Each structure stands twice: as C-alpha cells, then as structure tokens.
Amino acid sequence: MYLHDVWVNWFEGEENGYNVCHFHEWRKEDTIELLDQVPLLYISKELLHYIENDMHDLPKSLLDTIYKRGYTRKGQKRTVVEYAAVVTDGDNILAFDTVGYYIPIRKSRLIPRQEQLVYDMIENNKPQNFEFDNKIHDKEYHMLSMPPEYVFGLTRKERQLKQLLMIGLDQLRTTNNKEELRYWLTEWDPKQYPSIRYMDEEQVWTALYDGVKHGWSSAHEDLCSKLIRGQAFLERMWEAEMGNEQHTSNQK
C-alpha cells in the first residue's frame, strides 16, 4: 500500500511520541515537506510504540520492505528516500524517515484527511508481522526525557517550557548546592520555609522535583522564568516559546 502527496512536519531526534506534535499543534513557522509517495504499513501496537517512543534500530525486514519505495518532491524535482514510511496500528499513525540510517531520526503526524485515508486503506487488512526484540530495549525515562504522565494534557508550548524547566533543574541538581536548592524550593513553595532549613540536599531536591514534575501551571512558568535568567541560550528558547502561543498552522 502507498500514500501519495503526504504533508509531513518532521520532528528530528524525538525519542518520545508526545513531542511529535499532532496537526492542531503545527505552527506557521514549521517546515512542512511533501512526500510524493510513501509506503503504508499496518503493524502491531508493540512495534508502533517502539518506533514512536524510541530511537533504536528498526527491524531489518521492515527496512527491506520500504527500501527506496518513498519519494519527496520539491517543485519538479522528485528524489528517492532510502527508508521512509507511514505506519499505523489501527489507532495511532506516524510517518518516519531514517535519513539513511536504520533508526527513525525524523517523525511526523499526518493531517486529518490523510489520517482518515490511512484508516480507510487498512480497513479490511491485517497487521504485517515484523520480528523485533523489544525486551532488550526497555525504555528508561529521566528528568530530561520525562514519563508521558508528567506531560499528559499539556500543550506544545507547555511541554517545551517544561523541558526548559527540567534543563534548569538538571543544572541545579548537578551543582547540588544546599543553599541554592533551599532558595529555589522556597521560591516554589514558600509555605515549606520553616522546615526547609532543616532539610539536607537530598530532601530539598526530592521535595522540589516531586513538587514540579506533574502538570504545568502559572507557578511552573514563574519558576522556570526565574531559574533560567541570565542564561542566554535558555532565555532565547523561552522567548521563542512565549512568542509562539498563537502560531498554529491553517493547513487543510
């Protein structure tokens, strides 16, 4: 099965599916690419989850199936793509391009009408079986690659700002200065001030991280803006996100 004229918005190097934005979160400044032709594979839920939420080698049988079957188009120029496909488990849909490697470097969602076309095309088919050993690649989440439940329900802007906050907290954790940790926990939760001075570094860190790891709020935003102050690169990322609040695509 093949899809034609597929609009994709590539997110590069994303190991977590929650950062591969769905169409309603696409922005005007995102670079949209046209896949002139791309193979469509109906696969197992386990394999789709593996592709969507990791950056490991794809099954060789899958790579062989899609080898040089996809094309991009820019103007009149049609270019072959080594390993690209749209995959679905019957519920979720994902496009990927390995950029010549064996791992899904670039990932994208589809626009709604092309998602519907995928569902229509697989309606009377069964999933293909591609052997792979998922057990050797147990997913490990950490502060800079948060578990999905910590970002569930957040918008693209909120996810990006939370990532910034986690970068700031990671630096704080690395420095592990007791007074600095106490200061930031007081900023986050002033009500804890009377007991904070009796906490050691580990207790302060645990209280701070446990306090901020779930969800997103104006308090998270305030803490993030203060924590990254004076760090030019992080401040630029902050300003870019704050300016992107309403920038979503009108692509149909």
Swiss-Prot record:
Pfam families linked to this entry = DUF3603
Q: Which InterPro entries match?
A: UPF0736
Please, which domain of life does this record's source organism belong to?
Bacteria
**Record-stated family:** Belongs to the UPF0736 family.
HAMAP family per record: UPF0736
Protein name in the entry: UPF0736 protein OB1207
* Organism, as annotated: Oceanobacillus iheyensis (strain DSM 14371 / CIP 107618 / JCM 11309 / KCTC 3954 / HTE831)
